[in-house]
Curated annotation (Swiss-Prot):
GO CC term (a single one): pi-body
Residue ranges of every copy of the SAM domain listed in the record: 272-334
PROSITE patterns, A to Z: ANK_REP_REGION, ANK_REPEAT
Disordered: annotated segments: 1-23
Name of this protein: Ankyrin repeat, SAM and basic leucine zipper domain-containing protein 1
Organism: Equus caballus (Horse)
Length: 475
């Protein structure tokens, strides 16, 4: 029978697994001599040979069998077509031949489309990408979902293929579609720990706040599955990548995709993306990405930027429009700056009590803000170094600055104690000075007491006169 014809060449099985061990795609042997059909085969045997040729990836024999009359849309066991099988093993040459012979790219079996099969295929991303591109070029719909409401982009995200994800979106795939459990493509990527896919989806406009049916966001899903780097990145308030490619046209996105380097040429951390520092995140959050190179050329840090004055902004080439955005962001931080240079000089003794009290109140409020800021940093700072997502300088630099900060806080404490002692001394001397002029509050209180005593005395004297007069009249 047919099995006797196949000897000598090992072939691998493929396709989706099923409950039955016999899925219609047997592992067998294909004799090279049988690759050329010397005589017509019975229909049943021809179909078996066709399956074996597909399994072996023998494009020439597949074409010969198609020429002999086998339908390109033949239905094998479980309803799979030749194109569906070729897509499941990422055989680009077979996919191209079958499509050129009229195979339907939009075919589905029980809502399992050929495009979904290609996106969840076994093989390298490069091969999968080529197969998906071929299917999309033949009008395969990227938004048709399977029975679990999973779309091709979800399968690509789940299996860790960022370039396939980008290609699907470029051809109209909805990036924020949810499956029967409320999972989006971003949720699947976060669940499986695919950092490159997470970043690509954020570029393409994925909504990181969409929740699953049990109320979990992608960041929470990542945390639950112990992907802490992804959890930390998704938990950032400002997202420097969000929607970066969303506004590009289909042609622009494809062009950008094709000019992207392969994964082998990318850095280990977060694919080809540069790790973002605090300055970059701040600028991206305000839509001021164009200022990044300018500030880096001038070695301006975020701390320096946030303490700049009007003349410094202008001097460093920052336009008025950009200045307004930065100043508005500073205002939202609700950090009140004390302008010590505008206070009267203490040495001139011209400062009023109200001004001095206002100065002390502002100083106290500012210290409160600083304490709160440091407490927030302590609470948010990752405990372990491997959890840090953003690009950091050497820890020694941070330690050195903290040591200087501690020294300045100690100096401030010492100076405030001196100020307190001086104020107490002045107060004691004033109270003991005979020439001391009472405050208005003190004078007012004394006058009030005198008036009360005078009024009581007059009333008492008047009452005494009334009693005396009444006594004389009776006598």
């Amino acid at each position: 029978m047919a099995a006797a014809r196949f000897r000598g060449l090992a072939v691998a099985g493929g396709g989706e697994s099923s409950e039955s061990e016999d899925d219609g795609w047997e592992i067998g042997y294909l004799d090279r001599a049988a690759q050329k059909l010397k005589e017509p085969l019975p229909i049943e045997e021809k179909n078996e040979t066709f399956k074996r040729a597909l399994t072996a990836g023998d494009v020439a024999l597949v074409e010969e069998l198609l020429d002999s009359g086998i339908s390109v849309d033949s239905s094998f066991r479980y309803g799979w077509t030749p194109l569906m099988y070729a897509a499941s093993v990422s055989n680009v040459d077979l996919v191209r031949v079958l499509l050129d012979r009229g195979a339907k790219a939009s075919f589905d079996k029980d809502k399992q489309t050929i495009l979904i099969t290609a996106c969840s295929a076994r093989g390298s991303e490069e091969q999968i990408l080529k197969c998906v591109e071929l299917l999309l070029s033949r009008n395969a719909d990227p938004n048709v979902a399977c029975r679990r409401l999973m779309t091709p982009i979800m399968y690509a995200a789940r299996d860790g293929h960022p370039q396939v994800v980008a290609l699907l979106v470029a051809h109209g795939a909805e990036v924020n579609t949810q499956d029967e459990n409320g999972y989006t493509a971003l949720t699947w990527a976060a669940r499986q720990g695919h950092k490159n896919v997470v970043l690509k989806l954020l570029e393409l406009g994925a909504n990181k706040m969409l929740q699953t049916k049990d109320g979990k966001t992608p960041s929470e899903i990542a945390k639950r599955n112990k992907h802490l780097e992804i959890f930390n990145f998704l938990s950032l308030t400002l997202n420097p990548l969000e929607g970066k490619l969303q506004q590009l046209t289909k042609e622009e996105t494809i062009c950008k995709l094709l000019t992207t380097k392969s994964d082998k040429e990318k850095d280990h951390i977060f694919s080809s993306y540069t790790a973002f520092g605090d300055l970059e995140i701040f600028l991206h959050g305000l839509g001021l990405e164009h200022m990044t190179d300018l500030l880096k050329e001038r070695d301006i840090t975020l701390r320096h930027l946030l303490t700049m004055r009007k003349d410094e902004f202008t001097k460093n080439g920052i336009t008025n429009k950009d200045q307004q955005k930065i100043l508005a962001a500073l205002k939202e931080l609700e950090v009140e700056e004390i302008k010590f240079g505008e206070l009267p000089e203490m040495a001139k003794l011209e400062i009023s009590g109200d001004e001095f009290l206002n100065f002390l109140l502002k100083l106290n409020k500012q210290c409160g803000h600083l304490i709160t800021a440091v407490q927030n940093i302590i609470n948010e700072l990752p405990v372990n170094s491997h959890k840090i997502v953003l690009e950091w300088a050497s820890p020694r630099n941070f330690t050195s600055v903290c040591e200087e900060l501690v020294g300045k806080v100690e100096d401030l404490s010492e100076e405030v104690c001196k100020l307190k002692d001086l104020i107490q001394k002045l107060q004691n001397e004033r109270e003991n000075d005979p020439a001391h002029i009472p405050l208005m509050e003190e004078v007012s209180t004394w006058n009030s007491r005198i008036l009360k005593r005078t009024a009581i005395t007059v009333c008492g004297f008047g009452f005494l006169l009334f009693i005396c007069k009444l006594t004389f009249q009776r006598q």
